[in-house]
Swiss-Prot record:
Alphabetically ordered keywords of this record: NADP, One-carbon metabolism
GO CC terms of this entry: methionine adenosyltransferase complex
Protein name as it appears in the record: Methionine adenosyltransferase 2 subunit beta
Native source species: Danio rerio (Zebrafish)
Binding locations of NADP(+): T26, G27, L28, L29, Y49, N50, R51, N60, L61, C82, R86, Y146, L172
Gene that encodes it: mat2b
Length: 323
């Protein structure tokens, strides 16, 4: 481990000098991970690409020389790899670019990680959703190219960096730059279209999980790994509230005291609805819990309110609730 003896005595770890590199730091999860480490006495370096500057380092993760240069210069004790193409329908349409980011960039990063503890963010979509819940040792069987690309990314990470950790998470939401940034927060648009009825999926079961909670888990894992180099392999983290997108949308309406009578549950998947999704890929998360590394998930209504209140159309609501 750069900077001190990885896995050695605790006395050798000097808190101000703990360094973490966060890839995809401009993205939905990456921003939360970067903030979590930064706010807890870590020297954090975030990198991105299209949206990197001026706050983060611009780095092309497909450029081995660039990746090597960043790691050798910063010498991180921990790397959290959040960068990914995480939109299943986009992966289907732009497969080559998605595979480059979701698979080949993983291989590059893992090869160059050196003594750093590497956490790779993966997905519940590595499972087919036919026999939940899924434990860390259950056999993956992804239904779509996104799930296949993330599974290949896992394999590249663990092949080139056997001491790495894979953290699988479900559908995510959190503080967004625009509501379309998350498949959960985008449902707010349906809520605020109160004048027109709209149908919303009421088939597929989801476990919407707050990015701030995932970020806390990443920091817990990182801090444990500095003391215990046996922390490696596959882990699961998920919120426990089970909802369809219809139920999420109704919960969002309730959180903002908005009507939901215009929302209509759709109980059959329409033909041509994009990439196939698993019916219920619930993650069983006992490994993190047994190690004392899990965190209690933030209740959905609280977290979604914190995430979406800046996008409320009626500005008077903010004054009523927050003042």
């Amino acid at each position: 481990m750069p900077g001190f003896n990885y896995g050695g005595d605790q006395d050798e770890v000097y808190t101000p000098y703990r360094r973490v590199l966060v890839t995809g730091a401009t993205g939905l999860l990456g921003r939360a991970v970067y903030k979590e480490f930064k706010n807890n006495d870590w020297d954090a370096l975030g990198c991105g690409y299209n949206r990197a500057r001026p706050f983060f380092l611009k780095c092309n993760l497909l450029d081995e020389d660039a990746v090597r240069g960043v790691i050798q210069s910063f010498q991180p004790h921990v790397i959290v790899h959040c960068a990914a193409e995480r939109r299943p329908d986009v992966v289907e349409r732009h497969t080559e670019a998605a595979m480059n980011l979701n698979v080949h960039a993983c291989a590059t990063l893992a090869k160059e990680a050196g003594g750093s503890f590497l956490i790779y963010i993966s997905t519940d979509y590595v499972f087919d959703g036919r026999n939940p819940p899924y434990g860390e040792n259950d056999a993956p069987n992804p239904l779509n190219l996104y799930g296949k690309s993330k599974l290949e990314g896992e394999r590249e990470i663990l092949r080139h960096c056997p001491g790495a950790a894979v953290l699988r998470v479900p559908i995510l939401f959190g503080e967004v730059e625009k509501v379309e940034e998350s498949a959960v927060t985008v449902l707010f648009e349906r809520v605020q279209e109160g004048a027109e009825s709209c149908t919303i999926d009421h088939c597929q079961q989801r476990f919407p999980t707050y990015t701030n909670d995932v970020a806390r888990v990443c920091r817990n894992m990182a801090e444990r790994a500095l003391q215990d180099q046996s922390l490696r392999g596959i882990f699961h983290y998920s919120a426990k509230e089970q909802m369809t997108k219809y139920e999420m949308t109704c919960a969002i309406a309730d959180a903002f005291n908005l009507p939901s009578s215009h929302l209509i549950p759709m109980t059959e998947q329409p033909a041509g609805a994009g990439a196939q999704r698993p019916q219920n890929a619930q993650l069983e998360c006992s490994r993190l819990e047994l190690l004392g590394l899990s965190v209690e998930s933030t209740p959905f209504k609280n977290a979604i309110r914190d995430s979406l209140w800046p996008f409320q159309h009626d500005k008077r609501w903010r004054q009523t609730v927050f003042h």
